[in-house]
Amino acid sequence: MKHHRLAIVRQKYRPDGGAERFVSRALTALSNQNLELNVITREWQGEKQDDWHIHICDPRKWGRISRERGFAHAARALWQQQQFDIVQSHERIPGCDIYRAGDGVHRRWLLQRTRILPAWRAQMLMHDRYHRYVMNAEREM
């Protein structure tokens, strides 16, 4: 029987984070399910089982936008080259099969935040280059 190839994408894996606990539990639960388990990450700090394939994807970064954009491009290129059957991402990367919006929708969060800010600060927040990048990535998904 053919193994389905699953890739889980998490930019940075630290064992103490919420999304990371989700990833770890999912990998453990899926270990005996006739799946090839792959993780695409910039950095892995946790324990791993022998049947997990950790793919380190660590492009250069100069700031928040280049960190997000660089990882998104590199991760997508890797999963396309590897031809995984299912790609589940915890990052806002267009082209994944399943997206876990653990942080919610960024635009909704920004709108909630602007409610408590002076008008000039709210406008600056909504026009910030990083926040515009994140909202655009969500739109592309």
Residue ranges and their predicted role:
Residues 89-93, 101:
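Short His-centered aromatic/hydrophobic patch
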Residues 18-25:
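Conserved alpha-helical elements of sugar-nucleotide-dependent glycosyltransferases
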Residues 3, 10-16, 29-66:
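N-terminal strand-loop element at the rim of the active site
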Residues 61-87, 96, 131-137:
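An amphipathic, basic-hydrophobic alpha-helix
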Residues 98-137, 141:
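Acceptor-binding helix/loop patch of EC 2.4 sugar-transfer enzymes
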